[in-house]
UniProtKB/Swiss-Prot annotation:
GO cellular component, one term: plasma membrane
Transmembrane segments: 3-23
Enzyme class: hydrolase
The entry's keywords: Cell membrane, Endonuclease, Hydrolase, Membrane, Nuclease, RNA-binding, Transmembrane, Transmembrane helix
Similarity field: Belongs to the RNase Y family.
HAMAP family in UniProt: RNase_Y
Known role: Endoribonuclease that initiates mRNA decay.
Species for this entry: Flavobacterium johnsoniae (strain ATCC 17061 / DSM 2064 / JCM 8514 / BCRC 14874 / CCUG 350202 / NBRC 14942 / NCIMB 11054 / UW101)
Record domain HD: where: 335-428
Protein name as annotated: Ribonuclease Y
InterPro entries found in the cross-reference section: HD/PDEase_dom, HD_domain, HDIG_dom, KH_dom, KH_dom_type_1, KH_dom_type_1_sf, Ribonuclease_Y, RNase_Y_N
Domain KH: 209-275
Single GO MF descriptor: RNA binding
Recorded topology in the membrane: Single-pass membrane protein
Length: 519
C-alpha cells in the first residue's frame, strides 16, 4: 500500500513537473510574442516620432532660411540706400565744384580784363606824367631865371620861414595850454576834495584815559576793595589799571592810558559785581576770561569793518590789527574811526579820478596799521605799517601808499598821494585831534618801556597819571634784595632819560605762589 502510494506520488510529481514545463513553455512563447508586438509598436512609434522631428527640423530650417534671407535683403537695401545717398552727395559735390569752377573762370576772365584795362591806364598815366615832368622842369627853369634863386635855395628859404612861424605859434599855443591846464587842475582838485569831504560825515572822536564804572550802591565799594585792600590790589595787578575808589557816589573810576586794559578792567568788574564772588583767585580767573573775550571782540570788529567797507581777501592778522584800532588813538582821534574815514575818502576820491576804488579803500584802511603793534620799533609808523603789509601779501601799490603817506619813501603809484591827502583831510578837521593827549599817552608808554628794559620784569603799569610806576617781577629771577635795587635802578634811568612833571614813584612788586591741584 505504501509502495503504491509512493509510486502514485512519484508519478503525480512527474506529471506535475511535466505539466509545469508545458505551461512555462506556453508562457514564454506568449511573452516573446507580446515582446515582439511591443517592439514593433515601439519601432513604429519611434519611426513616427522621427518623422515628426524631421518635419519640425525641416520646417525650422526653412523658417530660419526665410528669416536670414529677409535680414540679408534688408542689409542689401540699407547698403543700396547708403550707396545711393553717397552717389547723390558725389553728384551734388561734382555739380557744386563745376559751379565753383565756372565762377572762378568767370572771375579770372574779369580779372584779366581789368588787368589789361589797368595796364592801359598805367601806360596813359606814364605818358601824362612824362609830359607833366617835362612841363614842370621847363617852368622851374623859367622861375629860377626870373627869381635869381635855384630850386634848393628857394626850398630852404620857404622851410625856414615856415619853421619860424610854426615855432612862434606853437610856443604861444603851449603857453596858453599850460595856463589853462594849471587853472583847470586847481579847480578840479578843489572840486574833488570839496565833494569828497561833503560826502563823508564823521563824528568828532576824542579819547580819554578814564572810564567810570557805575555801581548800584556804595556798599559794593567795600567788597571791591576787600579786606585790607587785597581785592583792589589783585585787580590792579591783573589788569594794570588804576582803580580809584573815592567819595563819588555810586561810581568807581578806572584810569589807564591803554583802552584795552581799561575795557578789560571794566568788564571784569561788571562780571565780579554781578556774580558776587570777589576774591583774588576769582579776580584772576575773570580777568583772564575777559581778556580772551576782548581778543575775540577785536577779531569780530575787524571782520565787521572790512565787510562794511567792501574789502575782501584781507589776511587774518591784518583783520586782527584793524580790530585793535578800536582801542588805539592818534592825537586823541580814535584810530579805527580815523582809518574808516580815510578809507571812505580814498574811495570817493579814486572814483572821481577814475582809479581803482577797492584798492584805494584798502590802502586808506591800512595806512596807520604801524601805530597798532604793542612792541616798540625804531621805524616810523608808516614804514612799520608798510613792512606789515608786505609781510601779509598786500599789493605793491597798497604797500607804497602806506609807507609814503608821510613822505618817508618815494611815491610810486597814484594811490600814494590820494592816501596822503585823505589822511590830512581826516586829521585836519576842526576838533578831530588833540595833540596834548597823544603826547601824554606816549609819555606813559615810554615810562613802562623803561621798566621793561630790565631783566626779570614781567609787567609794568604806569598809573596815577604817570606819577607812579608799578613793576611786577618774576620771583624766580628777582630776589627780595634785588627788588629794592631794581626799584632804584629804574628810578635812576627814568630820572636820566625822561622829562616829566613832578615826581615818579617806582614800586616793585614781587610775589611768590605755591600752587597744587587736588585730584
Amino acid at each position: 500500500m505504501d509502495i503504491i502510494t509512493i509510486i502514485i506520488g512519484i508519478v503525480g510529481i512527474a506529471a506535475g513537473f511535466a505539466i509545469a514545463k508545458i505551461i512555462e513553455k506556453s508562457n514564454i512563447s506568449n511573452l516573446i510574442k507580446n515582446a515582439k508586438k511591443e517592439a514593433a509598436s515601439i519601432l513604429k512609434d519611434a519611426n513616427l516620432e522621427a518623422e515628426n522631428i524631421k518635419k519640425d527640423k525641416i520646417l525650422q530650417a526653412k523658417e530660419r532660411f526665410i528669416e536670414l534671407k529677409s535680414e540679408h535683403e534688408q542689409v542689401i537695401l540699407a547698403r543700396d540706400k547708403k550707396v545711393a545717398e553717397v552717389e547723390k552727395r558725389v553728384r551734388d559735390k561734382e555739380s557744386q565744384v563745376s559751379n565753383e569752377l565756372s565762377k572762378a573762370k568767370k572771375v579770372n576772365d574779369e580779372f584779366e580784363a581789368k588787368t589789361a584795362e589797368y595796364n592801359n591806364k598805367i601806360e596813359v598815366l606814364d605818358k601824362k606824367q612824362a609830359e607833366v615832368d617835362k612841363l614842370h622842369k621847363s617852368q622851374l627853369q623859367q622861375l629860377e631865371v626870373i627869381s635869381g634863386l635855384s630850386a634848393e635855395e628857394a626850398k630852404e628859404q620857404l622851410v625856414e620861414g615856415l619853421k619860424a612861424e610854426a615855432k612862434t605859434k606853437a610856443m604861444s599855443h603851449i603857453q596858453e595850454t599850460i595856463e589853462e591846464a594849471k587853472l583847470t587842475a586847481q579847480q578840479e582838485a578843489k572840486k574833488i576834495i570839496i565833494n569828497t569831504i561833503q560826502r563823508v560825515g564823521t563824528e568828532e572822536a576824542v579819547e580819554n584815559c578814564v572810564s567810570v564804572f557805575n555801581i548800584e550802591s556804595d556798599d559794593v565799594k567795600g567788597r571791591i576793595i576787600g579786606r585790607e585792600g587785597r581785592n583792589i590790589r589783585a585787580l590792579e595787578a591783573a589788569t594794570g589799571v588804576e582803580i580809584i575808589v573815592d567819595d563819588t557816589p555810586e561810581a568807581i573810576i578806572l584810569s589807564c592810558f591803554d583802552p584795552v586794559r581799561r575795557e578789560i578792567a571794566r568788564l571784569s568788574l561788571h562780571k565780579l559785581v554781578t556774580d558776587g564772588r570777589i576774591h583774588p583767585a576769582r579776580i584772576e580767573e575773570v580777568v583772564a576770561k575777559t581778556a580772551k573775550q576782548i581778543d575775540d571782540e577785536i577779531i569780530e570788529v575787524g571782520k565787521r569793518t572790512v565787510i562794511d567797507l567792501g574789502i575782501h581777501g584781507l589776511h587774518p592778522e591784518l583783520i586782527k590789527v584793524v580790530g585793535r584800532m578800536k582801542y588805539r588813538s592818534s592825537y586823541g582821534q580814535n584810530l579805527l574811526q580815523h582809518s574808516r574815514e580815510v578809507s571812505k575818502l580814498c574811495g570817493i576820491m579814486a572814483a572821481e579820478l577814475g582809479l581803482n576804488v577797492k584798492l584805494a579803500k584798502r590802502a586808506g584802511l591800512l595806512h596807520d596799521i604801524g601805530k597798532v603793534p604793542d612792541t616798540e620799533s625804531d621805524l616810523p609808523h608808516a614804514l612799520l605799517g608798510m613792512q606789515w603789509a608786505e609781510k601779509y601779501g598786500e599789493k605793491d601799490e597798497v604797500c607804497n601808499a602806506i609807507g609814503a603817506h608821510h613822505d618817508e619813501i618815494e611815491m610810486k603809484s597814484l594811490l600814494s598821494p590820494i592816501v596822503q591827502v585823505c589822511d590830512a583831510i581826516s586829521g585836519a578837521r576842526p576838533g578831530a585831534r588833540r595833540q596834548v593827549l597823544d603826547s601824554y599817552i606816549q609819555r606813559l608808554k615810554d615810562l613802562e618801556d623803561v621798566a621793561y628794559g630790565f631783566s626779570g620784569v614781567k609787567n609794568a603799569y604806569a598809573i596815577q597819571a604817570g606819577r607812579e610806576l608799578r613793576v611786577i617781577v618774576e620771583s624766580e629771577k628777582v630776589s627780595d634784595d634785588n627788588a629794592a635795587n631794581l626799584s632804584f635802578e629804574i628810578s635812576q634811568k627814568i630820572q636820566t632819560e625822561m622829562t616829566y612833571p613832578g615826581q615818579v614813584k617806582v614800586t616793585v612788586i614781587r610775589e611768590t605762589r605755591a600752587v597744587n591741584i587736588a585730584k
